[in-house]
Amino acid sequence: MRIYPVNNLRGAINLPGDKSISHRAALLSAMATGETRIENFASSADCASTLRCLQDLGVEIRRENSTVFVKGVGKTGFHKPLQELDCGNSGTTVRLLSGILAGQEFDSVLIGDESLSKRPMRRVIEPLTQMNAEFESAAGNRLPLTIRGVNPLQAISYKLPVASAQVKSCVLLAGLNAKGKSKVQNPKSKVRLPSSRNHTELMLAYLGAEIEENFIESEDGFVQEISIDGNSKLSAKDLQIPSDISSAAFFIVAAACLKNSDIVLREVGLNPTRTAIIEVLKNFGAEIEVLNRKEICNETVGDLRVSGSGNFAPKTNSNIIGGEIIANLIDEIPILAVFGTQIENGLEIRDAAELRVKESDRIAAVVENLRRMNARVEEFPDGLKVYKSNLKGAAIESFGDHRIAMAFSIAALFATGETEVSGADCAAVSFPEFYEVLGEIVS
């Protein structure tokens, strides 16, 4: 994919449905009683993996463009699969589906592509083993993962060692098939807010689950505890998926960095556990306005208007991002690092070691590609520091990672000269229409 610099971006665009919410909509609809209509379902290959696995478990699914119809089978109505369940590149599919399969009375095997097969699954194996499910895995707790389900599972109280929406969701989904109430505690936080994405909790409540959230206060912070009753039943309800803010982040950064840009991103999900990217960009001077804010299916949604200024410096006198906020920024860090090349005195990102075990080693991938584009950058075990730099077009390696491909395609828009991104088609993992949508607003 060859990309050339542009003057600015202009126009209003619709983005695909949120990937995180789409996964959960499909899985919870399958566990519900009745048929669910899901509108604006994500077009990503990852979400297609979730649908395919559910079909292999006997769930009837029909897709009409971006609308998906799911006939729920209830909490224990899944069929023993006739083959291995292929999760493709989707870690979300593996981890959330593990929670459901742990409570079924049959064995199943989860597999994935080469990238996913390198990612450790210990964080879901541990709590599910405590709930009496049994597992066999490849060396290092990797795929293929055999799950020997039990029903009912044993309810547990589980303290997450690190904030993780996927592990939390896995335990909550398993809790639907447990005897009694299962509880999940997030790590202590300085603020009385969820410390990871809460799409699962919001959707469970919307579909009728008996789920409670409490904040346990101590002298030095708050511990969020979520409990779910194994007697809960889910009832089908139509769902509308907001546009994906993680996909929106690429266009927000592009428009902010190109002077005289003016774009509107329609009906973007503005869940407070996902808007850290907007807060960070605004703190550095990006001009972002929220319009038409509303609630849809328990999720906050609004239009985002972004104007290009091209002048960025921190309002808080700190160019360092780290600590608790990282859990709510983890998918946006590659594009945030690109943005750092445009900030006065640059940007330092810490406490992001989790990026080492994503679809690629994202820290190493970002550092290498920034250096190829003439940026000055330092690498740390848990992050990086990028200095304000005049980017130059270069040969970029995507490493088969969709977020790397898209982040450096955006960098190419305000670099000097031609940039070629190898393996750019991997963007389809989360955003198949990325280059098409970008073309709509380039001027």
Model-derived features: where do they sit?
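Structural preference for solvent-exposed beta-strand-turn elements
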Residues: M1-S443
